[in-house]
């Protein structure tokens, strides 16, 4: 039946007149529709291939995608072709998708945000409680310097001042020296030296250098032993190193093994750290600043008390007598019983050339002294006629007399030092034999303090007797 219907339709179509052909527009519309479909297919072929995984699926999997920017660009391009209405639809679609993405959070993200919020809250509470604690009234065990000019009270101004002072003290704790007084009180007057001499170690008494062949080597400056030994009879010598204790202590022990010349050792840990430099603050020495003198090779070391300082150029390891030329001036200061060394140091315009300037002054004084003595001899005609004034009666310059007496004392002092060295060696040998093990500590075999003192006294007597025997043997050998 279907085939018969098709044949009848074809025959009827052939018999239609030309002026009645009104169905042709339908055929044309079909061809236009087919052409648009073909163009759409061509455009789809030219487009880039799209992935099966869309942005929603990637976001659920936890992958970060740059879909917002790319999508907005593609949609803006399509909107330009399609019209303003499509642009509005795309923008609204983007906003809606953005809201969905922002609202989509995993359980892990929610926990992280919750923990972060708790952390911020607890941090703020901790800061607030810390500020209130630092603003409290002064405690009885806090230093008076910290409480200076800020009384107790809970007014906002006083609380802020106390909080600020305590906050600043946290940082000054690491900048200030470890103790307010770096040295113990001076001994009583009969045993006290008139002045205190602070000496640097690096590039003043010793010089260290590194070479590829031998590594680190430390050289002792020529005349250091004589300088320390001679001035120790006039000064309380304090060695103040610019290096840390773990490096400089061994060098200091080599300079003075029995502590006969150097009274105290200070190191970089005892410096004041200020403005990026380490400063040797003489006011922390527990001594009268008018009787303290410092010799250093770094001007930053004495920047707080430049009126107490003598500057020397850093020693480069070559032989020189720069250190020994300071002895006459330092000896003059100590023997004149001055109450304040600062005016004398200030009388020298340049503290870098004090030895030369002092030598010129001494030469002028010596010439004046000789002229005065010559005038006295000329006036005494009777002694001149008898020839008494010309034979053995020429007076000596006072500074020369002081130097001669100092040399005698130095010789006697060095003899005592050599004897003490021998005695100290014997003491070290005896102390090395007397040891206690960890087993003795655990079992309680350690003697009481009274017994230890008794043992030490007995050992000391044995050392004294042994030392006297050695002296007798040396005397007998010397007489032979």
Curated annotation (Swiss-Prot):
Residues 190-333 form the FCP1 homology domain. Pfam families: NIF (PF03031). The keyword Protein transport applies. Residues 63-107 are annotated as: Disordered. It comes from the Eukaryota. The keyword Hydrolase does not apply. It comes from Kluyveromyces lactis (strain ATCC 8585 / CBS 2359 / DSM 70799 / NBRC 1267 / NRRL Y-1140 / WM37). PROSITE patterns: FCP1. Gene3D superfamilies: HAD superfamily/HAD-like. Residues 1-39 form a transit peptide. Its main location: mitochondrion. This is Mitochondrial import inner membrane translocase subunit TIM50. InterPro entries: FCP1_dom, HAD-like_sf, HAD_sf, TIM50. Keywords: Membrane, Mitochondrion, Mitochondrion inner membrane, Protein transport, Transit peptide, Translocation, Transmembrane, Transmembrane helix, Transport. GO terms for biological process: protein transport. Essential component of the TIM23 complex, a complex that mediates the translocation of transit peptide-containing proteins across the mitochondrial inner membrane. Required to direct preproteins in transit and direct them to the channel protein TIM23, and possibly facilitates transfer of the translocating proteins from the TOM complex to the TIM23 complex. Residues 40-118 are mitochondrial matrix. Residues 136-480 are mitochondrial intermembrane. It is a single-pass membrane protein. GO terms for cellular component: mitochondrial inner membrane. Component of the TIM23 complex, at least composed of TIM23, TIM17, TIM50 and TIM21. Interacts with preproteins in transit. It is found in: Mitochondrion inner membrane. The chain crosses the membrane at residues 119-135. Belongs to the TIM50 family.
